C-alpha cells in the first residue's frame, strides 16, 4: 500500500521522462544560434582607472540558465548581461564560478526552457570538422566559422593566463568570439 500515491506517480513520471531526449538539446548547426549568447561585462576597470565594457560569447549548457564562457570575458566585471537571438533586451546574469587557470567561467541567468548544447563525448582527433560559433568584433551578428582540429591537445600562453590542454584548430577566432562553443556538425 502506498502512503503517498501522488509522490509515487511523480517518481514514475520522472523516470519515464529521463529516458526521453530533452527537446531543449540542440542537435544541428542551424539551431546552435538559439544556445549561443553575446555577453557584456559591465564596469571593467583598466590599468588607467577608466571604465570599459568587455564583450564576448558563451553558450547554454542546461535548460535552466547555466552558461559557459571564458574567464577573461567576465574577469573584473561589476556586472554581466547576456543578449540572445530570441530576446530584445539584455538579461542580467550572475557569475557562478571561474577558473583563471582553465580560462573558464560559468554564469547564470534566471528562467528555464533555454535551448542548450550537449558536451561532445567522442574522440577528438586531427582532421575533425568543427565550427566556432559566437558574436565577433563586439557586433550583434551571430557567426558560424568552419575549420578542422589540427592538434588534439595544445598548451598556450595568453595575456591573461597559461592555458593547458586546449584544442588547436583552424577556425578563425576574432575578438568577441571568446567563450563561444567549438562544435561538430551535430551541435555538440
Q: What do the PLM-derived regions correspond to, one by one?
A:
Residues 2-60, 66, 70, 79, ...:
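N-terminal activation segment of mature serine protease catalytic domains
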Residues 18, 22, 32, 51-54, ...:
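Solvent-exposed, acidic/flexible segments
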Residues 24-27, 31, 119, 126, ...:
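Extracytoplasmic/secreted proteins, especially bacterial periplasmic and envelope-associated proteins
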Residues 32-51, 90, 108-116, 142-188:
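Active-site region of chymotrypsin-like
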Residues 36, 44-45, 62-142:
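Conserved active-site neighborhood of the chymotrypsin/trypsin-like protease fold
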Residues 54-58, 65, 97, 127, ...:
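Glycine-centered flexibility sites
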Amino acid at each position: 500500500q502506498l502512503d503517498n500515491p501522488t509522490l509515487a506517480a511523480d517518481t514514475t513520471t520522472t523516470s519515464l521522462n529521463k529516458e526521453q531526449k530533452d527537446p531543449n538539446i540542440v542537435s544541428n548547426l542551424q539551431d546552435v544560434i538559439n544556445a549561443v549568447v553575446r555577453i557584456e561585462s559591465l564596469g571593467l576597470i583598466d590599468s588607467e582607472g577608466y571604465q570599459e565594457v568587455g564583450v564576448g560569447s558563451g553558450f547554454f549548457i542546461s535548460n535552466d540558465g547555466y552558461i559557459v564562457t571564458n574567464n577573461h570575458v567576465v574577469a573584473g566585471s561589476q556586472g554581466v548581461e547576456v543578449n540572445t537571438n530570441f530576446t530584445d533586451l539584455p538579461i542580467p546574469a550572475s557569475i557562478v564560478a571561474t577558473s583563471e587557470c582553465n580560462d573558464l567561467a560559468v554564469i547564470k541567468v534566471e528562467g528555464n526552457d533555454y535551448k542548450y548544447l550537449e558536451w561532445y563525448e567522442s574522440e577528438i582527433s586531427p582532421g575533425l570538422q568543427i565550427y566556432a560559433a559566437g558574436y565577433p568584433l563586439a557586433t550583434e551578428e551571430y557567426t558560424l566559422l568552419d575549420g578542422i582540429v589540427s592538434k588534439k591537445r595544445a598548451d598556450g600562453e595568453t595575456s591573461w593566463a597559461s592555458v593547458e590542454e586546449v584544442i588547436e584548430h583552424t577556425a578563425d577566432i576574432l575578438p568577441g568570439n571568446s567563450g563561444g562553443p567549438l562544435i561538430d556538425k551535430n551541435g555538440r
